[in-house]
Structures are given as C-alpha cells and as structure tokens.
Curated annotation (Swiss-Prot):
This is RNA-directed RNA polymerase 2a. It comes from Peanut stunt virus (strain J) (PSV). Its EC number is 2.7.7.48. GO terms for molecular function: nucleotide binding; RNA binding; RNA-directed RNA polymerase activity. GO terms for biological process: DNA-templated transcription; positive stranded viral RNA replication. Belongs to the ssRNA positive-strand viruses RNA-directed RNA polymerase family.
C-alpha cells in the first residue's frame, strides 16, 4: 500500500501501488498464511488451547514457538454438528455466563453463539489490519456475544501529522452524495459488519413528524368520584382524563371564491341532471318490491340455519315518510322481514370466499405485525405515548348516555355474559347505487352484527383509548381521517402530478379469517392493550352465533368481521393497513390515507408492489382501480391554487341523497327534515373554496371514475349552493302528506267566523258568493264601522270533517243580519232569526 509522502504526491504516484509494494504485500501474506496449514485453522490467542482443550484436534500439530498466535481447528460446521449438551458446554466455557437465581445472564442462544464464533475467526485472521490489539480468543467471542468492546488496549491517539510545510490540504467535497457508513459505538465496526448490535433498531426514528408532535398533552384532571367504579376497574386503568391541544402555528387561510349560478337552478334543472347522469334511476320505483319479495318463493343453501316459525313476519308496516320531488333512484326503507333477512345473510355473511392457500398463521401474523410497525409508526413516539385514557373515556361515555337512563348499575358482568352471542339486523337504509343496473338488479341491504348496549359500553372506552394512541404515533405521511385531530384536509400537499393507488377490497367483512384475527391481536398487543384482554376479545370472535330475534333467523359464524361491535372501524382500518404494508413498500409513497376498507396512496414515482398477494395470501378480492383517482370515503380530493388539498363529496351521491325516501313525515313537526338539512349543509362546507381551477379538477376526476360526462357538475354545484342557503328553500324538495291532511283538517274546527263586506242601505247590492269569507280560530272582531259580523257555532252533535264546513256555512247564512257582535262568539246554540 502506497504511503503518503511529498515526493509521491508531486510525482502523481500517491494512491498507486508500486511493484515493490506489491511484492512486499505478497510476501507478508505468504508468511502469514504459512502459520495456517489448512483452511480449517485460524490463528488465535495462545491461551485458548489451555482454557478450552475440547476445541483441539489430535491430528493437528501445535504451532511453533516463534508464531505469536496459536491455531484453533474447529469450524462453524463443528458447532452445528454438536449436540445440545456439547454446545451448552462450549457456551459455558467461552461466554462464562452468570446465574441470578434461575436466570442465566446472558441467555443461551445457539445461533448467536455460532455467529459470534464465526465473527471472531474472521477478526483474528485480519488482526494485523487493526491499529489496536484484539482480545484473546475466548474473551473475543464473549465480547462479541455480549456486545462489549473487542479490543484489549485503550484507543491510541494518532500523533502522525499530515501537514507539509508550504502546502495546505483541504478535504475534498464529494459531489456524488457519498455518505460515511454508520459505525457501531461499541466496537467501531461498520454497521453491516457489526454482529453485536442492530443499528437499524437503535437508529432514531424522528425522520418523520407525527400527530404527537403537533398535539401536546394539555392537562390531566381527575374525573372519577365513584368508589364502586374504581373498585371494578383493573390496575392498568388510571382515574384521570387527558386533554390534547394543538400547538402548531395557525396559518392564515385564503379562500378564492367565485359566484355560483344559483339563480338559474330549479327542481326541473336538477331532475334533468339526474336524467342525464343516472338514466336507469329515473324510472326506478320500488314501491311494491317488498311485496314481491314476501309473496315469492324462496330457497336457500345455507347450512346450519335455524328458523323460528312462530316469529315469521309476513308483512310489516313501512310507516309514513316524506316524498321527494326529485326521482334519483333512492330506495325505500327496508323492513327486516324473514325473507329480507335471509337474502341479506346470504350475500353479506354466507358464501365466504376461499381464495388463499395454506400459510403458516403464526409466522405470517408476527411478520405482518412487525412490518406494520416499521411502516407506519414512529417508534419513539410509540414508546413515549404509553398513556391510555380508558377511565376518562369511560366516564365521558357514561355521561353521554346518562340522559337515556344508563347508569353504572345497569352494566352487566362480562364474565357472566355469553359474549359469543351476537344480535343481528338489516340496515333500513340502502347505500345509493351509482352503477346503471337498477333496471335489472335490486340492491341487497347490509347487515349489522352487534353486542348488547351494556357489553359495547364496556369495551368501547378501551378501544377508543387504543385508537387515540394509535393516531398519535402515526408517521406524518399516514392519515386516518377520523376524530378531532385528523381529517382529509391536508395543507401544503397537492394531489396533482402524482401517481395514485386506489385499492378496492370487495366482500371485506366476510372474507376475513383466522390470519386477520391473529394480525389484529399482534397489533393490539403492540399498542399496549393488555394481553389477556386482547386474547379474550379474539377468542369469542373465533366462533360466534348470530340471531335476528324479530325475523326468527339464527346461524353460526366464525372469524368474519362483526359489523356492529366496538372494534369494527378500528379493526377494519388495522387490517387494511397491515395488508397494504405487506403488499407494497410504504417508503415509496408521499402520503397514505386509510379509513375502514378504503385506501389511497400517492407517489412521485411509478408504484411497484404485489397486488396479487391480497388474493393469494389474504383471501381478499382486490381490484386495482384503473384509472386511479384521488377518491376515498365517497369524496374527491382537490387541490386549490395555494397548494392545499380539501375533500369534496361525490356530486352524484349527493344528488341521490336529495331524493331520499327515508325521512320520517312528522306533519307540522319539521325536526326530522331540519336534521337532514343541517347534515346537508355540513357536508357542503367546501363550497366557498370551489373555483374554476378546482371545478376543472372535479370534472376531470368525475369523468375518470364514472366514465360519464362531467358537464353536469356545474349544475349540481349550483343546486347544492341554492338548497343549502336556508331551510325554507330546502323544504321545496319534499312533500308531506301528513302536513296536507293537517291543513285540510284545520278547517273543521268548532269555531268559525263569517265576515261580510259592508253593504250600503241606500243601494241594493247584489250579493254573491265572494262576499262571504271563512276564517278558523279568529279571536278578535274587526272594529271598522260598516262591517257586520255574525258569530255562529256549530252544534256539538254535528259530524266533523269536510261535511261539517258545509253545514256550518248553511247555519251561518240563517243567522240574523241585524245582530252585530263586537266580541268572540259565546258557546251555545246559534241565535235564531226573529
């Protein structure tokens, strides 16, 4: 190796090996190799043969006295060939562990011992290359095994100076992005050569911001005063409530607005949009579909199905609902009759697909949970955020339901309840269908499988606390849009000019099996859920029994997602994220969004992954949407001119919601309709941010997703802006039969007053029918002179209804024209003509 000198530097020979140096290096290697006769021997310290005679072989001669290092004639293969007793003896001789009671320190590990011996052999064979002296062989193996210093002497300070009189040498800046490899702080070796430490595990995980950096713990306050409550809680629960506050600086918002053409919007124009966008929906009428279902024959191939014939419901009253003016293909409320429940169970719970092959459940579940942690969590934030606000959430939950009469005494004993028994029902609301298939297919309602309220109220606080910790530990590029501290609104992030990945997982709930349940258990333990509770929760999800008491239908199920328990949304989100991290390298994405079974990711580079693993390994019917669009949770993601991203509800689905048939008709009570109006206004809070730039994006994404013309988006947005202005305009979209009947029946009251226009006595004026006006519930007579008011009251024996109006008018015409009353009519029979 060429040494540094001024002569070699000026001659240009620095860094080049001369022939003399090459010959010297070869001679040195030849002398060193002469001490090693075979490939099975390596030099070692001389005290190895004395301390470890079991490692010497009789067929290998001892080294000469001139050789400073002796040879050890065993290989890694020798250790692998040893029995457990022999390898244990080698471990005790080399590592020399200590015993604290029954605990061995360090703990014996055969693979680690073999690796330490192999590294020690390699270090001794290259001992001349190190400036410091290595330890003896046995101590060297023990140091590598324990992760201690492998050198025997203290570090040597470099005294050699590279300074040359008259010359100044500056370090060369490497423009190719060269970065020094990480060195182990204990042994000084390069990270990938160090066998005693995992540098990747010790690396600081502050590369990405998390929600815990933005939200700090604001206060801790005691909230529980009930001693009985505290006595029934576990030791891991703390009777305090934590509050978080946002600490990042608030940025001034600039909303670029534009006028919306609300003056040209009408019900007819919105109906024209429906006719164009939803051609099969405008003729859809499901008024008698329930009758067709109940009167037709029904066959099912579900095994282990139990029907209770005494509970069969042939027909159920659908109730009174407001009639929408728009025809958007919205379905009527579904009734949980026996045949409707059987149809829903066959589609939602039965016919479970079996697409995956045989896998090692334990190994795969642990590996997927490990990948989940590495892909999404900031490990330091996870370690620091070890507080679970279970008691505070439980107290808030009980206060929320205190108005309904729920108290702590009403909570059942979970150990005395059969947690494998679930109640079942069908959803009365059917999700709007955007495909043009309503003319040939009737949508099947979704099902809900749930525990009783008392059981859910005891599990919900724990899972809410785990979800809060889960959100606080997520990396900054992972978004779960739920709760108060996360949403789809993303500042300083644009969805434009990026590759998009949108995975559609169909039959998500019933396709989950034992592998998905074990993955959830591993992740729950990772988040700090007590192991006994997570195991208990997963045990009664392995085999369950669902029962629809109203329809008299019951059947057993196993593993699949319970769609109405305390862990439904959280569990579905965890499963989606875990499957996504296993099939795709999450480091290639700039932003990832997950919500239930929906997922969306953005990348600057073309996306690479194994989407077929969703089916072959995880038993999921996955569809990679092509072309992918920034669409999640039935919302489009748009970016404004300032580079901020916000969400816009799907215009097609919002248009369908305007024609819903499931708003109860309260007559004069408009509370139900007003609640729908407030929800409609809340969903349209994005309207002030819509500009020509964002509307153009919405049209493009709309056309990409639905393969339909986006020209109707302008009319839809104008309609949304008009009908979200005030409640009076919104009421034009619905017709109330109860309100019509109430207005008609209001004219059949007992008190009627007949007002006549003034008649001049000097002139004979011909009376006509327009001179008589009827008013109901008039309490004050006009005081204008020249008016005659006749007070009349119908007999209480007369019939009420529309015919009563005619009889009252006839009776009023028979009253005296000369009698004038300045006060409301008194009760009693009407006065007779004199």
């Amino acid at each position: 190796m060429a040494t540094f000198s001024l002569e070699s530097l000026l001659s240009g020979a620095y860094g080049v090996d001369t022939p003399e140096e090459v010959a010297f290096i070869r001679e040195r290697d030849r002398v060193f190799a002469s001490g090693v006769d075979t490939a099975e021997s390596v030099p070692c310290s001389p005290d190895v043969s004395e301390s470890d005679p079991c490692f010497e072989h009789d067929d290998i001669p001892s080294t000469s006295a001139t050789c400073p290092l002796e040879r050890v004639s065993f290989l890694v293969e020798d250790l692998n060939a040893m029995s457990d007793v022999e390898i244990k003896t080698v471990f005790e001789n080399l590592i020399r562990p200590t015993y604290v009671g029954c605990i061995e320190v360090p703990e014996f590990c055969r693979n680690k011992l073999t690796l330490s011996v192999s590294v020690a052999r390699n270090l001794i064979s290259t001992a001349s290359r190190y400036p410091r002296k290595l330890k003896a062989y046995s101590d060297l193996v023990a140091s590598i095994y324990n992760g201690a210093d492998i050198f025997d002497d203290a570090p040597v300070d470099e005294t050699v100076s590279d300074e040359v009189p008259g010359y100044i040498f500056l370090p060369v800046e490497r423009p190719d992005g060269y970065e020094r490899p990480p060195l182990c702080s204990d042994c000084g070796l390069i990270g990938y050569q160090c066998a005693c430490h995992d540098l990747a595990g010790r690396r600081a995980a502050f590369a990405e911001m998390t929600i815990s950096h933005t939200y700090e713990l604001e206060s801790l306050s005691g909230v529980i005063d009930d001693a009985t409550l505290l006595a029934n809680l576990g030791s891991f629960l703390l009777p305090i409530h934590c509050e978080y506050s946002r600490v990042d600086p608030s940025l001034s918002s600039f909303h670029l607005t534009q006028p919306h053409p609300t003056d040209r919007v009408s019900v007819e124009s919105l109906q024209a949009v429906c006719d164009t966008s939803l051609p099969t929906h405008v003729c859809y009428d499901d008024t008698y579909h329930q009758v067709f279902v109940e009167n037709s024959d029904f066959t099912t191939d579900i095994d282990h199905l139990t029907l209770k014939q005494s509970d069969l419901i042939p027909k159920a009253d659908g109730g009174n609902y407001l009639k929408p003016v728009l025809t958007t293909g919205s379905g009527s409320k579904r009734l949980g009759t026996t045949k409707e429940v059987l149809t829903a169970i066959k589609k939602r719970n039965a016919d479970v697909p079996e697409l995956s092959g045989s896998v090692d459940l334990t190994r795969i579940s642990k590996a997927v949970a490990r990948r989940f942690k590495e892909s999404y969590f900031n490990t330091n934030a996870l370690a620091q955020s070890n507080f679970l606000n279970v008691v505070g959430n439980f107290h808030a939950y009980m206060q929320k339901w205190a108005a309904s009469g729920l108290t702590y005494d009403d909570l059942p004993d979970l150990h005395a309840e059969n947690l494998q028994l679930y109640e079942h029902m069908v959803k009365s609301d059917v999700k709007p269908v955007v495909a043009d298939t309503l003319n040939v297919d009737r949508p099947v309602p979704a099902t809900i499988t749930f525990h009783a309220k008392g059981i859910t109220s005891q599990f919900s606080p724990l899972f809410i606390s785990l979800f809060e910790r889960f959100q606080r530990c997520l990396r900054g590029r992972v978004v779960v849009p739920v709760g108060k501290i996360s949403s789809l609104e993303m500042d300083n992030f644009s969805v434009l000019n990026k590759h998009c990945l949108e995975i559609d997982l169909s039959k998500f709930d019933k396709s989950q099996g034992e592998l998905h349940l074990m993955i959830q258990e591993e992740i729950l333990n990772l988040l700090g859920c007590p192991v006994d509770i997570s195991k208990w929760w997963c045990d009664f999800h392995r085999y369950s029994y669902i029962k629809d008491k109203r329809a008299g239908v019951s059947m057993p199920i196993s593993f699949q997602r319970r769609t109405g328990d305390a862990f439904t949304y959280f569990g579905n989100t965890l499963v989606t994220m875990a499957l996504f991290s296993w099939c795709y390298d999450t480091d290639q994405f700039d932003r990832m969004l997950f919500s239930g079974d929906d997922s969306l990711a953005f990348s600057l580079n073309p996306i690479e992954g194994k989407s077929d693993w969703f089916t072959s390994l995880f038993n999921m019917e996955a569809k990679n949407m092509d072309p992918p669009t920034p669409y999640i949770c039935s919302k489009f993601l748009l970016t404004d001119e300032l580079g901020n991203t916000f969400s816009v509800p799907d215009p097609l689905r919002e248009l369908q919601r305007l024609g819903t048939k499931k708003i109860p008709d309260g007559g004069l009570d408009e509370s139900y309709l007003k609640a729908h109006f407030m929800s409609f206004v809340d969903r349209l809070k994005f309207l002030p941010r819509m500009t020509h730039h964002t509307v153009a994006q919405l049209i493009t994404f709309y056309e990409m997703k639905y393969k339909k013309s986006g020209a109707e988006c302008h009319a839809s947005l104008g309609g949304f802006a008009k009908y979200s202005t005030n409640f009076s305009i919104y009421k034009e979209l619905y017709i109330s039969d109860q309100k019509r009947l109430s207005l008609i029946n209001s004219y059949s009251d007992d008190n009627f007053e007949v007002e006549r226009k003034p008649i001049l006595k000097s002139k004979k004026v011909k009376r006509n029918r327009k001179d008589v006006e009827c008013r109901a519930n008039s309490y004050e007579a006009p005081k204008t002179s020249g008016k005659a008011e006749v007070s009349a009251q119908t007999s209480p024996t007369k019939q009420e209804g529309p015919w009563a109006q005619k009889s009252e008018r006839v009776e009023a015409s028979r009253t005296s024209r000369d009698s004038v009353s300045l006060f409301p009519a008194s009760t009693g029979p009407p006065p007779r003509r004199r």
